[in-house]
Amino acid sequence: MHLLINIIFLINIIFIISIIFIERRNPQTTWAWILILTFLPILGFIIYILFGQNITREKNFKRKILDDKTKQKYLNSFKSHYKLDNISLKYKDLIMMNFNNDNSTYTQRNDIDLYFDANSLFQEMIYEINKAEKFIHMEFYIFKSDEIGKKILQALTKKAKEGVEVKLLVDSIGNSIHKKDIDKLKAAGGDFKIFFPGFCKYINLRINYRNHRKILIIDSKVAFLGGFNIGDEYLGKDKNIGNWRDTHTKIKGLAINDLEARFLLDWSYANESDLDIDLKKYFINPHSTNLPNNIIGAQIVSSGPDHTEQQIKNGYFKIINSAKKNLFIQTPYFVPDEPMLEALRLAALSGVDVKIMLPGNPDHKFMEWIANSYFESLLNAGVKIYLYEKGFLHAKTIVADSSICSVGTANMDIRSFSLNFESNIFIYNEAISKSMEEQFFKDLKVCTKVTLESFEKRSIISRIGESIIRLVSPLM
């Protein structure tokens, strides 16, 4: 046993050397790993094996080059359509940053609907799936074989039998679809893939990198993107959770092209095959006469460990810094890095009405402690913090100055910004932004406001937990 501990300690030293001199991570993350590998050697060793290893640089660059080249094929055809309305002109620098960092095309011919409850969303999804004529592409983090999951799987299987191309991509950790349901889909002609599978059912050394996206695209006519996964709990059927508050979008128009490109890139990666895109088959022609007439500016922005930049985080950062009047944020998990924390503080100190809404009943106690560790600094700067009490808040949204908003899969935490594969839609439109604001204020009615006075009354155990877990927050 003593020999084993010495071996683990030696390996941990090698890990530390690699983190400092080879991986060259940011100082916060580096110090967090040094602390846990040094003072908790056995636990630290296990955690590092499961959560600490970076995807190799070779894979990073290979995937990034594929991403850039593939998307550039069709992005070139959109350049002549790059026009900005008055709202979008205010955010020209954000639009250009998203384009330069992620090849995120700015489009205007879009219709966008918002969904705040799973019942109406799932009904609409099944309705659109049943109308499919050419293809259905679906990519989800969590997909369960429960009542709603089976309904959607049955709809997919039915369309596959009719000859519609059906591709279903799920995350290896989030997936819990029964094998018999997968077999039925495949037997009907559908295709099913797992993103980052482990080398056996219960062991996955790439657990640190999750495909957190929730995407559904049908015939390039309609797409869905947002925070809802597929399962009965999102319908409020889990007694331990209760009501599930989330936000999702339904998209029609040119913005679908970037979402389709993202799906195809993820699919080819999971399929371990080269990607040969048939533009006519999967993408909307920008000259089509069937495009929506609405002028709703939008960009699909994706990020992940395969990207050299943290695109969604950078987009949030620009929105926060550009806010002049108000800034409303909803996120189930709140673990900002120092630049993001300081941006929120500076916005409030500059007179911007900054409101952040978090779950009052979090699903993980340690995530509550981490979030709480940032409260005092934010409250002192004038940031208003609210805890949602009517069930669980899972929405990932940001809206500023009644003119710009973002909805998607990314939480406001280090994991979503740098480790998970995520996608958000950035919407440059007053009507959509005001709808988001209205829902935010509806949610405020069932929130508890956090004040410095009430916060200082928390228990000693909570204070100790916050202090300890804050040290490893860069790893969360």
Curated annotation (Swiss-Prot):
<feature type="active site">
    <location>
        <position position="396"/>
    </location>
</feature>
<feature type="active site">
    <location>
        <position position="394"/>
    </location>
</feature>
<dbReference type="InterPro" id="IPR022924">
    <property type="entry name" value="Cardiolipin_synthase"/>
</dbReference>
<dbReference type="GO" id="GO:0032049">
    <property type="term" value="P:cardiolipin biosynthetic process"/>
</dbReference>
<keyword id="KW-1003">Cell membrane</keyword>
<dbReference type="Pfam" id="PF13091">
    <property type="entry name" value="PLDc_2"/>
</dbReference>
<feature type="transmembrane region" description="Helical">
    <location>
        <begin position="31"/>
        <end position="51"/>
    </location>
</feature>
<feature type="domain" description="PLD phosphodiesterase 1">
    <location>
        <begin position="207"/>
        <end position="234"/>
    </location>
</feature>
<comment type="function">
    <text>Catalyzes the reversible phosphatidyl group transfer from one phosphatidylglycerol molecule to another to form cardiolipin (CL) (diphosphatidylglycerol) and glycerol.</text>
</comment>
<dbReference type="Pfam" id="PF13396">
    <property type="entry name" value="PLDc_N"/>
</dbReference>
<keyword id="KW-1133">Transmembrane helix</keyword>
<feature type="active site">
    <location>
        <position position="219"/>
    </location>
</feature>
<feature type="domain" description="PLD phosphodiesterase 2">
    <location>
        <begin position="389"/>
        <end position="416"/>
    </location>
</feature>
<dbReference type="InterPro" id="IPR027379">
    <property type="entry name" value="CLS_N"/>
</dbReference>
<comment type="similarity">
    <text>Belongs to the phospholipase D family. Cardiolipin synthase subfamily.</text>
</comment>
<keyword id="KW-0443">Lipid metabolism</keyword>
<feature type="active site">
    <location>
        <position position="214"/>
    </location>
</feature>
<keyword id="KW-0444">Lipid biosynthesis</keyword>
<keyword id="KW-0677">Repeat</keyword>
<feature type="transmembrane region" description="Helical">
    <location>
        <begin position="2"/>
        <end position="22"/>
    </location>
</feature>
<feature type="active site">
    <location>
        <position position="401"/>
    </location>
</feature>
<keyword id="KW-0808">Transferase</keyword>
<dbReference type="GO" id="GO:0005886">
    <property type="term" value="C:plasma membrane"/>
</dbReference>
<dbReference type="InterPro" id="IPR030874">
    <property type="entry name" value="Cardiolipin_synth_Firmi"/>
</dbReference>
<dbReference type="InterPro" id="IPR025202">
    <property type="entry name" value="PLD-like_dom"/>
</dbReference>
<dbReference type="InterPro" id="IPR001736">
    <property type="entry name" value="PLipase_D/transphosphatidylase"/>
</dbReference>
<protein>
    <recommendedName>
        <fullName>Cardiolipin synthase</fullName>
        <ecNumber>2.7.8.-</ecNumber>
    </recommendedName>
</protein>
<keyword id="KW-1208">Phospholipid metabolism</keyword>
<keyword id="KW-0594">Phospholipid biosynthesis</keyword>
<keyword id="KW-0472">Membrane</keyword>
<feature type="active site">
    <location>
        <position position="212"/>
    </location>
</feature>
<keyword id="KW-0812">Transmembrane</keyword>
<dbReference type="GO" id="GO:0008808">
    <property type="term" value="F:cardiolipin synthase activity"/>
</dbReference>
